[in-house]
Regions:
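The feature captures the conserved acid-bearing segment of alpha/beta-hydrolase catalytic domains
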Residues: 40, 46-98
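Extracellular ligand-binding interfaces
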Residues: 275, 287-369, 374-391, 398-404, ...
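Gly/Ala-rich beta-loop-alpha elbow adjacent to hydrolase catalytic centers
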Residues: 20-24, 28
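Gly/Ser-rich "nucleophile elbow"/oxyanion-hole loop immediately N-terminal to the catalytic nucleophile
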Residues: 1-21
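Surface beta-strand/loop "capping" patches
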Residues: 128-172, 194-200
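Short beta-strand elements
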Residues: 229-272, 399, 404-412
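Short, aromatic- and glycine-rich surface loops/edge beta-strands on solvent-exposed regions
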Residues: 213-229, 371-376
Length: 413
């Protein structure tokens, strides 16, 4: 492919770039690590985690680490924090293995194998800098985690201030697995990332970590968000067109195991909470979506021990919308429809597991081991039976403005 491009009259053979998503991300790394005609590359969701295969032939021919260590051109890794194919802990190895002095990354919290425009746009900006020479991507922020005896951890970040900074968001999880191979997919795809909004100082930004259990590992990183002078339009994942007015640069992730946290005498500030979401300012940072123009949201809060359901609990929340509607609430591959009366008054909704059904008509047996909570106007769930093509749709078109929600919690009868 590179040779073909070199021979085209409209192509500058000295400015060839490679990017790809998923298996295309792996192929980006393999191509870039084997051909120095590539002048810049941007692998997405791949090319960093094929390092666990013990077969000698695999390890020496198509293992990701073999090719990463041969790369010397500028690299930008697009690596969602919960991606199953390019795992965020392996990214930390990858950025050390690459031999290029020009390496950046972005890591969308909660996302698995998809991204939103503020992350997707990085590929275009990277090539604008290194192939077109008409843009400058900020440097990777430097970070330091202060662990203070009997006090809360403090994360300190020094971002590149060559551009205006919109905000700095710190994310941490205590559900990371240090040995995180392909056999641990549930954790990889569903671990919950707590959000802390960093506050600016004279040169750095600070974030104090509120809830920490020293008996569990701690993974923490930061996203620095920058505005774009003008909107950028491009082709994103799965052939979708995106429009971005800002972009994100991530820091490397600090990873500490529980033994180190305990040795340091870190204060145990972990507390369980029946309140899953209070919908106060910034709440959406701990929820996620993939479609910018829709209001449906998802979260992995219910997978985190802090918000796991107590025995005999009911899921409750209050909702208000002007029009009569049907709201869909989803739990993993189950869903339930909720009738909303409409009007100015808040309506309390109480749900038990038996109200949630799957594509095969089975009901949710309990809240134990649930991983994802969702709400939206409609959704289709798919059967988990091997070989089954059964699907079941819930909800439908929404009337009027999006709903308001408050006081999402576990309640006991």
């Amino acid at each position: 492919a590179l040779t073909f491009l070199e021979e085209q009259p409209q192509v500058d053979p000295n400015r060839l770039g490679v990017y790809g998503h998923s298996m295309g991300g792996k192929l980006t790394v393999l191509t870039t690590g084997s051909d120095d005609r590539v002048k810049a590359a941007a692998p997405s969701c791949g090319g960093i985690s094929d390092r666990y295969n013990t077969d000698p032939l695999f390890r020496t021919t198509i293992g990701d680490d073999v090719y990463l260590s041969r790369i010397r051109c500028p690299m930008f890794f697009l690596s969602p924090a919960n991606d199953f194919h390019g795992r965020i802990n392996d990214l930390q190895e990858a950025i050390r293995e690459v031999q290029s002095p020009e390496v950046r990354m972005n890591c969308a919290p909660h996302h698995n194998h998809q991204d939103t425009p503020d992350y997707e746009v990085a590929t275009q900006l990277w090539f604008d800098q290194h192939l077109k020479k008409n843009f400058e991507v900020p440097e990777t922020p430097s970070t330091k985690l202060m662990l203070r005896e009997k006090r809360r951890p403090r994360f300190i970040l020094v971002p590149d201030r060559s551009r205006e900074i919109l905000s700095v968001d710190v994310y941490y999880t205590q559900q990371g697995e240090i040995v995180d191979g392909p056999g641990n997919m549930d954790n990889t795809k569903n671990r919950f990332w707590h959000h802390v909004k960093a506050t600016p100082g004279k040169a750095d930004w600070l974030a104090d970590i509120s809830f920490v259990n020293p008996n569990r590992p701690l993974w923490i990183y930061a996203n620095v968000n920058y505005p774009l002078e003008k909107e950028v339009i491009g082709a994103g994942y799965y052939y979708g067109i995106y429009k971005a007015d800002h972009f994100t640069i991530s820091s490397p992730m600090t990873m500490l195991d529980s033994d180190r946290l305990k040795k340091l005498g870190l204060a145990d500030t972990f507390k369980t909470s029946a309140i899953i979401e209070d919908f106060s300012e910034g709440w959406e940072k701990e929820w996620f979506h993939y479609r910018e123009n829709e209001w449906a949201r998802k979260t992995h809060k219910v997978y985190e021990p802090r918000w796991q359901a107590p025995d005999g609990a009911m899921l409750s929340f209050e909702v208000r919308t002007r029009e009569e509607n049907t709201l869909v609430v989803g739990i993993d591959h189950f869903a339930a429809e909720v009738k909303i009366n409409g009007g100015e008054d808040w309506q309390k909704i109480v749900l038990n597991p038996g109200q949630f059904t799957d594509a095969d008509g089975a009901v949710l047996k309990g809240w134990g081991k649930i991983k994802e909570l969702r709400y939206g106007p409609s959704e289709t769930v798919r059967s988990k039976e091997r070989g089954s093509k059964k699907r079941k749709s819930f909800g439908g078109p929404w009337k009027g403005v999006k709903p308001q929600l408050r006081d999402l919690r576990w309640g006991v009868k």
